[in-house]
Amino acid sequence: VAQAIMEYLDCECTYFPSMADDDPIMSAYSYARRLGVREDFIPVLIKPDETLLECLVMNADPENDADCYEFNPKAVEEYRKKMLSAPVKDGKAVLEELTGQRKEEAEEDDMDWEEEIIGEIDGGINNDRFASYWDSDTNMTVPLILAKIPVKNPWEIFAYLPFGNWNECLDTLELMAVAKYWFEQYDAVPAAMSHDELEFLLPAPVPKEKAIDVAVEQYG
């Protein structure tokens, strides 16, 4: 499945087998980030599995009724061009609409938004490493792909990695809009992902006075 995802991405990729220490992964990622500034690519760490491949193919090659391993590369390329040429939506508006929906649901369930959903900031831990690529059962990393996505702007990676648009997940243009908004607000860059997780790298923590607002945006 990792090979199929690398073929789907059609860009320079490095495969990392499972390991007990993620230093080699983070060293390669950090180097790729520096190199990407000069060579116009954004590095992303990807946890490969069949569900992710199915999501990518479902979005980029919707006519494909066959096995997800047998996607049409031309259709995928056209999809990328279409997504990259589309105007980027207002990310703040996308998040506000989603938060509004969550508030309505809470009201329907007789839940107090401020007390039961928001609550208070309490405790917390230092979050200084990615979580999505660790296997909690073995305390080892899962197999990973480091992909050098050939785009200039961080939010454009979703043209290559359209992993949403199922259940209540955002579609590709919404993902791009939200990622652009968070980049403009916090310099947040999509950095690691699986079929149902997305982690951003920030140069500094979100300011404490903004933390609740960002948490609500993510909850939406």
Sequence positions of predicted segments:
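Extended, low-hydrophobicity segments enriched in charged/polar residues
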Residues: 1-156
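Helix-rich interaction surfaces within compact, conserved domain-sized segments
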Residues: 213-220
